Curated annotation (Swiss-Prot):
It comes from Haemophilus influenzae (strain ATCC 51907 / DSM 11121 / KW20 / Rd). This is Uncharacterized protein HI_1436.2.
Length: 54
């Protein structure tokens, strides 16, 4: 599953990620969504993760 993060040049990356996650949630359902979310988090650089939650 590839996520398209680029919706526009002025779009904040975190906002785009959340938007994609929301779309995928309704498309996949809760169980598949949580699995895909784990995959996405696993692909992130561990040093990047704290920035996402600040």
């Amino acid at each position: 599953m590839e996520l398209s993060f680029i919706h526009g040049k002025n779009c904040l990356p975190l906002y785009c990620i959340l938007l994609e996650l929301l779309k995928n949630y309704f498309k996949l359902g809760p169980v598949d969504f949580s699995l895909s979310l784990r995959k996405i988090l696993a692909t992130l650089n561990p040093q990047e993760i704290p920035k996402l939650f600040i």
